[in-house]
Amino acid sequence: MPLNFRDRFNVPVLKNGEEVAYLVGNSLGLMPHKTRDYVNQEMDAWSQLGVKGHFVSGKEDLGQDVHQGPWYSCDEPLHGLVGPILGASEDEVAIMNTLTSNIHSLFSAFYKPTAKRSKILFEAKAFPSDTYAMEAQARLHNLDPSEALIKLAPKDGLHTLSDDDIIKVIEEQGDEIAVVFFSGIQFYTGQLFDIPRITAAAKAKGCVVGWDLAHAAGNVPLKLHDWNVDFAVFCTYKYMNSGPGGIGGLFVHDKYADDQRPRLAGWWGNNAETRFKMLDEFDPIRGARGYKQSNPSVLCVLALRASLELFKEAGGIEKLRERSIELTNRLLKGLLASPHYIAPENIEIFGNSGKAWFTIITPQAEHQRGAQLSLLFGPDGTMKKVFDYLDDHGVLGDERNPDVIRLAPAPLYNNERDVDLAIKLINDSINLINGSA
């Protein structure tokens, strides 16, 4: 069932005024109308209150509330909004920093290599920033990344990792693995990993388990607490529509809520009651918020709040997932029916005809993907031609060189027209390339 929230967002338009089919919420979500209102309100508060905005609403000086609340606590309402999206309590989440910095923050607290258990297991084709972070963490502990990192790659001829293969490595090498750290949804292929199963296997071998949920948070329902995940990081500018470079977040399981483990501490993780007393001794807030470091950007926080309120109004992540499945299934069905589609197992047979073609490298089963489908085009040079044609005719997707276009219907603002237009234009563009238009 349509959720009818499209008119709550700013949808880009073509020169003729027609709305584009924006299928790239997996890269940057659209801006809710409310975001501009919230941000402008805080700009007004800054201009009228100055530094007092940290502690007052404006009523004391101006006779009326002029913003969403004191900046000192502006992020507090977000924990209750994002918790249900992650399957976490308010105390298990913190809105802070950005994704890679949060990876480093949590690895500093949870990656404790020993002589017997020092390795990190993750994807060979992880998002580059994750790879850089893993290599940096190894070096920070005076370890050789080539020895400390187990980079697990798909089998020859495949684009995705098997959950079974991941678990096999955990069972065989788990006694040497300190941290298992995968992406919930793989950024390139769109594969959704079996988070609870992989987590359980790793925990059974004594490993710490973390997840990069950049492409999973706000996309698929998660149950991080129930799955016994140790920690996780996420960004909010994709499916949670917080804006370019939007604030990130992290999850730390409640079983660590009262532990005083060393961390990259900062004053915003200190007990709020004594924070401004400027005491020398660090007294961490209970739970994930004890990992905060600096006061967050008010404008980024309010941009995220505007979108999270729409998540709640729409009925939550489970309701959005139902709509997401409808839209992505429609996209998948239309693409599979294309005369230019070649099944992955048939590419060697039919992919060398000289004609343009595409396949889908995202798993087709609903439980193995989120909103995104990744289309691989051939021969070389086809993807760019198709991408430019889509862009010129009102479909925005995401190109990943050398040969992939990612399309991701977002349930809050995409509709059947967007999906059907993408299917039509992909077929039209390949017809033109092949000279059969």
Swiss-Prot record:
One Gene Ontology cellular component annotation held by this UniProt entry: cytoplasm
Catalytic activity: L-kynurenine + H2O = anthranilate + L-alanine + H(+); 3-hydroxy-L-kynurenine + H2O = 3-hydroxyanthranilate + L-alanine + H(+)
Entry-linked Gene3D superfamilies: Aspartate Aminotransferase, domain 1 (3.90.1150.10), Type I PLP-dependent aspartate aminotransferase-like (Major domain) (3.40.640.10)
Binding site for pyridoxal 5'-phosphate: 99-100, 127-130, 183, 212, 215, 237, 267, 295
GO biological process: 'de novo' NAD biosynthetic process from L-tryptophan; anthranilate metabolic process; L-kynurenine catabolic process; L-tryptophan catabolic process to kynurenine; quinolinate biosynthetic process
Cleaved signal peptide residues: none
A Pfam family that the UniProt record links to this protein: Aminotran_5
Role description: Catalyzes the cleavage of L-kynurenine (L-Kyn) and L-3-hydroxykynurenine (L-3OHKyn) into anthranilic acid (AA) and 3-hydroxyanthranilic acid (3-OHAA), respectively.
PANTHER family per record: KYNURENINASE (PTHR14084:SF0)
Family: Belongs to the kynureninase family.
Protein name: Kynureninase
Organism annotation: Yarrowia lipolytica (strain CLIB 122 / E 150)
Gene: BNA5
